[in-house]
Amino acid sequence: MISIRLTSRIATLMVGLFFLIGCTQKIEPTNVQLDSQLTASDQIVDLATGKSLTPQQLVEQLAQSPRVIVGEKHDNHYHHQIEQWLVQEMPKIRPQGAVLLEMLTPSQQKGVSRVQAQMQSNPYIRDEKLQSAIKWNSGWPWEQYGALIRHLLSSPYPLLSANLDKEEVLFAYANPSSIMGQYSTQPIVQELISKTIESSHGGELTAEQVVKMTFIQQLRDRRMAESLLNAPTPALLFAGGYHATRAIGVPLHVQDLAPDESVKVLIISERGEEIDHLHADFVWYTPK
């Protein structure tokens, strides 16, 4: 009887051990390979010189800057593939200080940091549990961002929020004021932002709504600039193209807050869009 009980207990313990091993098994990092359409000649352009670059040449250029902003089109899977490739390749040249995301807000930071600490030992976490643990906003489709988020959470450098919380946006909309600064407050900048907002809403907004939404757009840009400047360097920010552009976005706020700090801008853009040196330092063209 004792032997049977002992055997049964050993079996139970073995099952438990196998369960624990299964829950903490290491997930081998995926080696991201760029689609051939992304590596063809003339896909990447140095906008200061007009010369074409290879992906590796671009990475080497970006790695020289303490701060890099990458602009994306949120619903283009090629753009997310490029972002995954960048965070895979840039640390091979120099250590990465931090990565910041427009898709994360301050209220998520505690959960993100906790999960990131846990994932340093590469435990298996199901997608549903992971999204819940970091309170992922479903407005950013997980099928687009999930692979990038998993990579960043398993990386040794901090993954940081760069956007406003919903409560901050609601307060700003109800109590609009103005951004302070020399570059970001130029009339042409605010006019371009306003026209972009009007166009994206089909001209259906009132003048008051446009003013409020322009302020919120600039408030988001200011927060991203502050977050980028406060992050450990080298720092990399992923955001939408309108936030990334030198013409109206985060780089102007960096100039206002820290005129002596340098930043490089890469905009990932669909073929057919016009991107020049006024918008970015580099452009990487992709299919739609």
Regions found by a protein language model. Give the residues of each.
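Bacterial N-terminal signal peptides that target proteins for export
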Residues: 2-11
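Bacterial N-terminal signal peptides
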Residues: 11-22
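Compositional signal for N-terminal targeting/processing segments
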Residues: 23-288
